[in-house]
Amino acid sequence: MKFRSDSSGGDEPRAPAAGDGGGGGDEPAKRQRTDPSSSSSQGEASSSSQPPPQQQQEEQPPEDAGEGEQPRVPDLGEDLVFEVLRRAEARTLAAAACVSRGWRQLAEDERLWEAACVREWANLGFSERQLRAVVLSLGGFRRLHAVYIRPLQWRGAGVPRQQGRRQPPVRLGRDQVQLSLSLFSIGFFQNMPCPKKDKGNDSDKNGGGQCG
């Protein structure tokens, strides 16, 4: 018997080998299927590494954070403050000295206290230059007002000492001013220290009498 040749068209076609070039057509399709998943995973990783825009806005400091602060008092300058305090009374000068260290140094100026004292005095009959020289040599106008003038104003107003701040300052007459100046000078000389004595005798170096 004769067998038919294998070249007949009835046989089934063989499957291409794995290493043949025919299988290369499926690889791009597989890559296209896998590329979207890999790109989506990369996008998720990049999106997770970057903070959302809302968190960035919250982390930034607000621009209007300083609106809640109290407005600062503008610096008027020492010259302008001095001219204002020069027209103030003694009570205002004492209150201004409690504002700050700079105002305290400014309020302790003897020219301000001189203006406050002379404004409340009557005409004494002698120049302000002579008065200034005497008072400054005895301790200053601020001490003169605190120790002698203010008690006279309280007594002249006829009110107790605790309520003296509620009353306006009383203008002193000529006799009261002279009395306060006399007491001021007496108090100054009473508080002067005794002169040093020699070791050999009890008399002082200038040949004066004994002290105490």
From Swiss-Prot:
Tissue expression pattern: Widely expressed. Preferentially expressed in unopened flowers, shoot apices and elongation stem. Expressed at lower level in the leaf blades, leaf sheaths, roots and rachis.
Residue ranges of every copy of the F-box domain listed in the record: 70-116
Domain of life (superkingdom): Eukaryota
An example Gene Ontology CC term for this record: nucleus
SUPFAM superfamilies: F-box domain
Region feature (Disordered): 1-74
Gene3D superfamilies according to UniProt: 1.20.1280.50
Bias-annotated ranges (Low complexity): 35-59
Principal subcellular localization: nucleus
Keywords on record: Gibberellin signaling pathway, Nucleus, Ubl conjugation pathway
Keyword Nucleus assigned: yes
Listed pathway(s): Protein modification; protein ubiquitination
One GO BP: SCF complex assembly
Subcellular location: Nucleus
A Pfam family reported for this protein in Swiss-Prot or TrEMBL: F-box-like
Functional description taken from the UniProt entry: Essential component of some SCF-type E3 ligase complex that positively regulates the gibberellin signaling pathway. Upon gibberellin treatment, the complex mediates the ubiquitination and subsequent degradation of DELLA protein SLR1, a repressor of the gibberellin pathway, leading to activate the pathway.
Subunit and interaction comment: Part of some SCF(GID2) complex, which consist of a SKP1 protein, CUL1, GID2 and some RING box protein. Interacts directly with SKP2 and SKP15. Interacts directly with DELLA protein SLR1. May have a higher affinity for phosphorylated SLR1 proteins.
PANTHER family linked to this entry: F-BOX PROTEIN, F-BOX PROTEIN SNE
Protein name as catalogued: F-box protein GID2
Species this protein is from: Oryza sativa subsp. japonica
Gene from which the chain derives: GID2
